[in-house]
From Swiss-Prot:
Observed effect of gene inactivation: Severely constipated due to absent or weak anterior body muscle (aBOC) and intestinal contractions during the defecation cycle. Reduced uptake and accumulation of triglycerides. Locomotion defects characterized by mild body thrashing. Partially resistant to paralysis induced by acetylcholine esterase inhibitor aldicarb. Reduced enrichment of unc-13 at presynaptic active sites of neuromuscular junctions.
Family designation: Belongs to the unc-13 family.
Tissues with expression: Expressed in intestine, body wall muscles and some amphid neurons.
SUPFAM superfamilies named in the record: C2 domain (Calcium/lipid-binding domain, CaLB) (SSF49562)
GO biological process, one term: locomotion
A cellular-component GO term for this protein: exocytic vesicle
Entry protein name: C2 domain-containing protein aex-1
C2 domain mapped to chain residues: 812-945
Pfam families, A to Z: C2
Amino acid sequence: MREEALESICAALSISFTEDPDHLESIIDRFSEIFKVKDHLNQLRKKCEKFQTFTLEIRPVGSSNCTENVYAYIIESETCRQLELKPTGTTKLEIGSDKNVSLKFGLSQKKDSTTSKKGLSRSASLLKKLKFSDKKNLDELKISIFPLDIAVRKNINLGSGKSTLLEMKLIRNDHRNMIQCLEFDDFLEMTRSFHEWQAQISESELYDGSLGDPTFSMFYSIAFFFEIPSFVLKLTEMTCFLVWDDEMKKLDERALADVSLKMTACESEVDLQHPLLSPALSYLNDCTCNTIRCILVPFSTEPFFPPVSPSRLKSINVALKLIADICVLDVWDEFENLANPSNFLSSELKKLLESSAERYGESLKKQEFNELCRTILNLWMSLSNESQPYYIFFHQFDINYIGAAMLKLDKYLAESIQISLKCQLDLLNLRIPTELENFTKTTMRLFVTLRNLLNMVEAFHLPECQLFHFEEWFTDISVFWTYSWREVTLQMVERTITLDEDGDSVKYGARRPLPAGLYSFLCIQKGISDDLARLEFTFPHHLVVCAASVVNIMCQNINAYARKLFSEAMRNHEEKASRLVRATNGIEQAMCFVEEGYRRFAQFQRLEEYVDVDDLSAVRSTSIRLLKSTRDTCEIQVSTLLSHFVNLKTDIVLKIAKNLCADGKESNSGLKSYMRELASSERIESILECCYGLVDDVRCLLLPNCFKLSTQHFATSLEQQIRKNIRQKQPAEYYSNIYVGFLNILIFKRLKQMYLKFQIALKYIYEFLEIEDRKDIELLSNLHLNSFSTKDLILSYYDSLCEKIDRTRFGNAPHVDVHISYVKMVDEDTISIQIKLIKMSPIEWIDVISDRVDYFVRLELFPKILFPSNKFESPTTNPMPQSTRPQWKQLFEIRVPLECFFLRGACLAISVFDHERFIDRLVGRGFISLHSVPQASEEKPTQRLQVPLLPNDFSDQNNVFYQLLKTRACRDSIAKEFIETRTRRHQRIRALQHYIRINRNRVGHMLLG
């Protein structure tokens, strides 16, 4: 230790224990032993005297004030000093550092040579004079007997019979400011010396860190003298203990704990500006860091990662307890520029953790694929179940346990897995199903484990690492998962419960019968969806491949399940009807399940989030196409099953058909004498009841779509039975009764309740026959047409002809321009039709017979059954000779009864003829429906109408009404007359064409001229 520091310590001890001289001597003696300064102790003490002096204050008391020329004599060992006292007030006598002096008082005499001196004087000769003068008999006072800082009054004999009362007080002067302050190194060395000396004299094997007496008094007196805070003192003791040399005597661990506890307790009282605090903290940091290195050396090979058991942390946690207490001191936060042991501890622990993770990563490279997969799975499980204590332990040192370890492990993990996957792909034999299945199970489990690891890593907001892109490692593998899904699910579908093991359908209660194996089938499809959802794909390649594959696999499973149900239902069995129903409903329910949930099953929501628009559109269109194809295939099988089911209901259908085809009388003819004749309404009620029963039974058995398909088969079956039982060549009333008899009877009776009942029944019948809004099936259309009267057929013929003309574009066909409108007559029972013929379009035509053309127009009302020729005239224009562009500009008026004008089928025919010698040749004919004629208006004139001229036999051969009239002509006079009229006209036209062919040569010479 520096000599200046020893001097300061000695001075501090001297001043601190000066009041107890005996104790001071023992303290100084202990000081010389501890610091080994016995050989020059006196020199040190002599140097320290300057730091402590004494002053005696003297003051006269009362009325006996000092007279002039009263002197005080301070007698030392070799010299004497004198000082004249002040008559009033306080006189101070500086004694010096040695109190072993005497004090005398006396009066000064004029003959005394010393009287001429004023103030304080000091000389050896004065001491001699004092000894031999008359003052030698004066009272002598020992300064050492005076108490410090206490006033003492004493009556002083001045000689010559004089005395005075003086009050004297001895004051000690400590010159602390002159003592050099201890530097931290000196204070640290002093502290170390105190504890080492105490440890040497201690009789126990372990040093507990407690200082004995008077060492304890010395240590704390020095600290108190130099105003060193308790916190700095404890910091210094802590640094001494941290670097303690155990070869001298081993330090008890309780010493560190005790100092740490006291250091924490007095931390709040520390003066942050104290000059020793900063160096003390700096040195403590160095010692702590060195201690941390020593503590962590035994743990350098400890496997901190992956976590195994919390017990492994117990030893290191105990070892770092004291260090942690030092690191968490609040005072570190006040000195940001100083190094902090907590940062060093964190970095060292992080190195240990990363080293452990690196060793673990190196071990992954040496493992086989299956072992690697098991290791990664165990890693995930240990992180999930055992990492919490490790996370808490490292978190207290500001270390992200999982994050730091996974960042170090990342490259090893990525390299090991990618190499292993590539090797497995190269070795995979697709011809061995078990090998493929094991490969897919292992890789899928590995994928899920990596997904879980990634989710854990993402929760700690780590920077980008290779694990974030682990899905790309499986780019060539995900397709094998779909193969495995397909094979496994197809096998599971084949093992579902058969219809033979299903039991009776009665067990389903009020629900529609379903096969018991359907639930297993639906669970299988849900399992595929769950597997896909568990993978949580974000890589577009996987999403596209697996989404399309899942839809395809489900469609294949539906086809397999449908084939299974179809083959089982088609077997001969006593409950075949029930089996057919269950199989049909099972196929339909399976299809509906996939159709309604395929977007959810195939993770379309993820597709929309991670896949671009083109790929998403491709997957969507592919899925829709697969589902449509599967639906079509299933409906074919369902249709076949339903056709067999309908065949089992033939008796009911036959009964309905026979009742529909009966004329209402023949069923009662045999019982006429015994029973009353059934009314038409009763017969209809019987038919409806039969329909009710059949429709309700089928509806309760089949799912809606299956029921709809079954109606097609029932309609076909009913049509076949009606065709077998319907009578041919019957009056229209017969067919009308079959088609609309229900409605006519109920309307004529005007029974509202029965009418509503009929509407409900008719709705079921239409549903049963799949007739929507009475639109046609073939049989119903035929019945409808045959129920028409001959008059209605003729009207329908002309109405259809007019509609077809309106809908057809005839291109360059000739036409007639007319203005047409109607006016109601005053009596309002007659309509006046006004037709103004304008012109006709140009016609390139030469009559081959007369070599000329003479066009004229005839206006006729059709049909003739409404407008007979003897009652309705046919206005005719004059022929226009030799004109291919005739213009008539004639106005005609035709009157029509009001009830006929708005009747559909009533029409006006504009016929253009070429006048001939033998017969007028029909050039063309146009038709205008009377109900389409606009009403005349003064505000808005009628527009010109172009009426196309068509051949006479236009649409006759293809018109269904014409063909029906032709068939009915053999038994109906009106139809016969209509057909014969048309036939004669066609014959005349054909005769003209025959004449032209015969005279072709003559006509040719005429043309050549």
